[in-house]
Amino acid sequence: MKVVTVDQMVGLEQAAVRHGVSLDTLMENAGLAVAEAARNELGGAAGKRVLVLVGPGNNGADGLVAARHLSRWGANATAYLVSNRPNSDPKMEPAVDYGVTVTGVDRDPELAALDQLMGRCHLVIDAILGTGKSRPLSGPVKAVMSRLEACRHTNHHPIFMALDLPTGLNPDTGEVDPACPKMDITVALGYPKAGLLGFPGAEHAGRLEVAGIGIPSGLAEESEINLDLITPEWTREHLPVRPPNSHKGTFGHTLVVAGSRNYVGAAYLAAQASVRTGAGLTTLASPSSVYPIAAGKLTEVIHLPLPEDNEGRIHPEGSQVVRSVLDRYDVLLAGCGMGWSQGTKEFLEKLLLGEIPHELLMVIDADGLDNLSQIREWWRRLGGPVVLTPHPGEMATLTGTSTPEVQRDRINSARQWSRHWNVTVVLKGAHTLIAEPAGLVRISPFVNPGLASGGTGDVLTGIIAGLMAQGLSPGVAAGCGVYIHGQAGEAVRMRIGDTGSIASDLIERLPETIRDLKRP
């Protein structure tokens, strides 16, 4: 599903008009979609009290249409005008005809009536400002937003729903005005706006739903929009096919180079995730002191012990051992739990930056990234297609910037550096991003604090490597892997909550997550 900027959304609406869809039809469809979402949230409209905060433009007109439908379905709907509407408002009279009560700031300068309405209603729809507003909030709009946020902290907290965008949220960047309230749900119209999937915007948007408004589906696909939200349908379409006459060689061989004396678990998690994602064979190359522990836990994995230094990290001489067998593997995963030292840096430099089999794919994570960042112009020496999976701190180290700089504009940061390095970048975090060198960025729909624990990144890396071993391209494997990882995390959260879940819980859920995704 395409994710759009304001200009791109305007372009799609104009293209829809050229294809015979009127702006009025788009507006009617938008209002109906929001009304249906509100009815679903309320468990039915009849007898429910709904307050629609109406602004001066098209967003407000959509809100009036929503109020009309809710009133038609039996709700007690009130349209509260935060700003003056046009004198000849084509959406006002039909709303009144269907029983919508209309009041507003001009009759309620102290906002006392607004406070009473919010105190009695079951649901509030924010239809004040849409994609056309980027100035700081002021005047009555700011005052109303402040009252809305204050209502959240009272004993009576109605459901807060935003129509397309919460008022005060920048649709392109996700920046928010200090007066922007936090919604329970945002119904994005047509396509989700980029700012709803960035932070702090996503936190203010609440749960995100996307409603079609009648824009012909082919228009977005034919456009040059290069930002996509990963969907289950997209993931299902790209999952590896497993023919009935398959054997273990059919599904590829992953080599996991990982672990150290202090981080045995990272090696285990990455290798086991590759196995559970469906790689035909997985080999773990780890320090000799890690080998007996890992071998006891990973009975389905082939083991390749490597020489180690006095601290239990892989010795630089281990690169010769690994390089001598590289032609046996389809994917090389390197970095998880390796630790950082001059020796591990030398090991990785000799392993990754020398001549390697041309068809070998690579995934580099965690300590592999930190070691890589110490090698001058490492990206010019990498061979073969590569996926990097940094969290924001690792991304800052790789780019020579800071974590706040990376987080301030995650999409452009991932896209820019993916192009510069000519690698696929998986920038982890809430709404993980997958950026490909050609400029396409995919966004994960998942935000799960339960995944903020040690080892979950190692699992993600193993999933991506396992999918690449089965023949998926780096960008597609990263997109599918991020979605599978997120969906497995949701399954864990549903079962035990988001406190106390561990990375191993994700691995247990991988086979059934993939099974469920394959079901139409």
List each language-model region with its residue ranges:
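Small-residue (G/A/S/T)-rich helix-start motifs and N-terminal tracts that mark the onset
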Residues: 1-82, 196-363, 370-387, 392-520
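Short beta->alpha connector loops
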Residues: 84-85, 107-109, 167-169, 192-193, ...
